[in-house]
């Protein structure tokens, strides 16, 4: 696989922990361990395995040849989606997984942060922007907060001309 390891200023992580701790159901020590383990989500080899097992890099980067049941040759291509991700706030890992897997699809992603985790996604995106602010992956993410169910916001955003799908992490309350 290869790749370059990047030294990251931990001040963004520390700030995220300090701001999240007062509103999180996770005890501060466990929260710190969660944040410390987030780098594992971005392990290159794991991400490459995910791409190959889910769709194949060929389908993300061009046309992937297939053989049909009767031997007929066809091609498939994965198109970058425009997604709204409604994230749960029960663990910083949700933001990390959303960003890592979203980056793999090469789409456009609007992250709706949970009221009890306004800092995990922003910390991760800030670290990515510190590394390369002009990178297409960095520029394809936005993280925002609005109160869930706010018709003035959701009535405008949740339209097919803006986003292809809404991805929801969480329980019944988040889905509604």
Task: Place the predicted regions along the sequence by residue.
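N-terminal Rossmann-like NAD(P)+-binding subdomain of aldehyde/semialdehyde dehydrogenases
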Residues: 1-75
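Rossmann-like NAD(P) dinucleotide-binding subdomain of oxidoreductase/dehydrogenase enzymes
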Residues: 62-176
């Amino acid at each position: 696989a290869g790749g370059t390891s990047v030294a990251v200023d931990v001040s963004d992580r520390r700030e995220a922990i300090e701001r999240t701790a007062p509103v999180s159901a996770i005890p501060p020590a466990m929260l710190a361990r969660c944040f410390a383990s987030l780098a594992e989500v971005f392990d290159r080899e794991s991400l490459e395995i995910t791409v190959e097992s889910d769709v194949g890099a060929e389908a993300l980067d061009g046309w992937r040849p297939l053989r049909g049941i009767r031997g007929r040759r066809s091609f498939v291509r994965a198109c970058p989606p425009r997604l709204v991700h409604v994230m749960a706030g029960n663990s910083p890992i949700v933001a990390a997984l959303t960003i890592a897997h979203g980056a793999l699809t090469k789409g456009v992603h609007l992250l709706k942060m949970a009221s009890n985790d306004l800092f995990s996604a922003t910390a991760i995106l800030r670290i990515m922007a510190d590394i390369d602010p002009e990178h297409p992956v960095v520029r394809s993410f936005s993280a925002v907060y609005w109160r869930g169910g706010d018709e003035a916001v959701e009535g405008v955003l949740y339209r097919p001309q803006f986003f292809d799908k809404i991805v929801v992490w969480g329980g019944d309350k988040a889905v509604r």
